[in-house]
Amino acid sequence: MRIVQLSDTHISHLGGVPADNMSLLADHINHDIRPDLVVHTGDVVIADPDSRPDRDAAKALLARIDAPLLVLPGNHDVGESADDPWQDLPVTSERIAAFTSAWGQDRFLVTGSAATRSDDWVFIGINSERLGSGLPEEREQWDWLADAAGQARGKSVMLFLHKPLWFPTGSQSGITVPEADRERLVALFADARLRVVSNGHLHRFRRAFQGEILAVWAPSMTFAVTADPGRGLEGESAPGIVEYRVEDDDVQAELRQVPGTGAVADVLAMPEFTAALAEIESR
């Protein structure tokens, strides 16, 4: 089974590099990879969770992907669950509702041989911004996760979300999910085999093991972030996607770059981003 993970596309209704890259990626997925499943792990839109034009532009571009597509939110899609949310844009019930109105869901569970070609794996996606938010939606997602963990009992699990569970320099607000939520989440799958945790958010590609769990960071399709090992930013910054090959009990995760795509190193030099930032600051 082939799964493609893309992340941090940061699409704007103004077009530019994000739209150009997404168009090339859709063609590459359709003609060269032909995966069984595509998962977007968030930051679909460029910056503003309240921009309907950006959501509409993202929907139009992602609709070009032929394979089954599941979309999870990032902090730029629904606001942030953090002590000091970016641009004072916290996650809210209204922002979650706007996301689910556009995409139909902010979590998923894929299981069964018809969907996965194997009864041995369960693929689960969650909204990382619900974690630690204190919203009613957080409690509702925990209840759903408890049921999902029950369905995954005795099986291998691949978990997708926007923010990482682990970071080389430890848990950090705005970078990782809260430590207590990470521990609760991992404990939920004690009767399953949590094999892979796949996130975005950090705009870098990295594979590392946390015990027996493979933790994969997916790079951004738009932005390149300079390595800074002292701050925990390890791995590769090249724009691209992660291709997973799942067969029986084995899973492989590889960075795959998309021909013709470019990366933005200085976000403030990107007119689509500065326009979104100006709109946020004007409110």
What feature does the model see in each segment?
Residues 1-61:
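N-terminal active-site segment of His-dependent metallophosphoesterases
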Residues 7, 41, 72, 160-162, ...:
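A cross-family glycoside hydrolase active-site/sugar-binding cleft signature
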Residues 12-15, 46-50, 75-83, 131-134, ...:
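Active-site environment of divalent metal-dependent phosphoester hydrolases
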Residues 17-18, 81-87, 170-174, 209-212, ...:
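Short aromatic-enriched loop/helix-cap "lid" or pocket-rim segments at secondary-structure transitions
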Residues 23, 188, 205-283:
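Binuclear metal-dependent phosphoesterase catalytic core
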Residues 27-38, 122-124, 133-216, 270-283:
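His/acidic metal-ligating clusters that form di-metal
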Residues 50-151, 156, 181-190, 211, ...:
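Extended active-site neighborhood of metal-dependent phosphoesterases/phosphodiesterases
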